[in-house]
C-alpha cells in the first residue's frame, strides 16, 4: 500500500492537565514551532480549555479537539458533554474509546461505538482508540481483539463517513508507563487494523485511512515509529505538554 496517499495526523491528548490560562501559554509556545508542519496538527484539550485553546490557535494550522463526548444529543446526563455541544463551540476533533476511559470510567466497545456515531452525526472528525492490555498480548490474542474493537466501533459507519475517522492503536500496557511497543510491534497491529478496514470497506478505503500509534510516542522514538509503513501519525500524551518535544514529533511526521 502507498503510504504517501494518506494524511499524517499528530494529535496531542492533554488528558486532565492545564487550566485555561496555562492552555493559552502552552499553545502560544507550540504554534510557532509547528507552523510549517507537513502534517495535520491537533490538540485535544479538557472541556474547560476549549474556548481558550480556540482563541490561542485562531489563524494557525493547529486544530482543537476534545477528549470524549456523550452519545446522546441532550438530556438528563449530569456532568456530560454532547458532540453537538462540542461542534457548536468550534471543536473539530474528538477522541473516543481511550484506554483510560475504558479502564476508569466503564467505556465498552458498544459505548465507544455510540460515542463515535454521535460524533460523526455532529460533524466531528473522530479519533477512535483501540488496543490490548498486557495479559491479552501475552495470551496471543492482540490481533483478534483489535480487529473486533475496530469492527464494533465502526458499526454503522459508511464509507463516506470513514473519511472522518482516524484509528489510534494504543497498547494499554504502554500508556503512561514509559514502555513503548517496538516499531515492528506497532506496525504489525496497525497493519491488522488496516486489513480489518479492507475487509469492511475495500482496499481504497484501507489505503486512505489514517492510523495513529498512541503508546508513549516521544521525541526520541517518533522517527522510527512514523517511518513504519502502516503508522500514519501519533496520539501523543505526555510529550504533547512539552512544546519542543511535541514539535519534534510533528517534524518527524512531516519527514516520515
Task: Give the residues covered by each predicted segment.
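Active-site loop-to-helix "anion-binding N-cap" substructures in soluble metabolic enzymes
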Residues: 1-256
Amino acid at each position: 500500500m502507498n503510504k504517501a496517499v494518506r494524511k499524517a495526523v499528530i494529535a496531542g491528548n492533554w488528558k486532565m492537565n492545564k487550566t485555561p490560562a496555562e492552555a493559552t501559554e502552552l499553545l502560544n509556545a507550540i504554534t510557532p514551532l509547528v507552523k510549517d508542519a507537513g502534517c495535520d496538527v491537533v490538540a485535544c484539550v479538557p472541556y474547560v480549555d476549549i474556548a481558550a485553546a480556540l482563541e490561542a490557535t485562531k489563524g494557525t494550522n493547529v486544530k482543537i479537539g476534545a477528549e470524549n463526548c456523550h452519545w446522546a444529543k441532550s438530556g438528563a446526563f449530569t456532568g456530560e458533554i454532547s458532540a453537538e455541544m462540542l461542534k457548536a463551540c468550534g471543536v473539530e476533533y474528538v477522541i473516543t474509546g481511550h484506554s483510560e476511559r475504558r479502564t476508569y470510567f466503564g467505556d465498552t466497545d458498544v459505548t465507544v461505538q455510540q460515542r463515535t456515531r454521535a460524533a460523526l452525526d455532529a460533524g466531528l472528525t473522530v479519533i477512535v482508540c483501540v488496543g490490548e492490555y498486557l495479559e491479552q498480548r501475552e495470551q496471543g490474542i492482540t490481533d483478534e481483539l483489535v480487529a473486533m474493537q475496530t469492527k464494533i466501533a465502526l458499526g454503522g459507519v459508511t464509507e463516506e463517513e470513514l473519511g472522518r475517522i482516524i484509528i489510534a492503536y494504543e497498547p494499554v500496557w504502554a500508556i503512561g508507563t514509559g514502555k513503548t511497543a517496538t516499531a515492528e510491534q506497532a506496525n504489525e497491529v496497525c497493519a491488522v487494523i488496516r486489513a480489518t478496514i479492507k475487509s469492511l470497506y475495500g482496499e481504497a478505503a484501507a489505503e486512505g485511512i489514517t492510523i495513529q500509534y498512541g503508546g508513549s510516542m516521544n521525541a526520541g522514538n517518533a522517527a522510527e515509529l512514523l517511518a513504519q509503513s502502516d503508522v500514519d501519525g501519533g496520539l501523543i500524551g505526555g510529550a504533547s505538554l512539552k512544546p519542543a518535544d511535541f514539535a519534534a514529533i510533528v517534524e518527524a511526521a512531516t519527514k516520515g
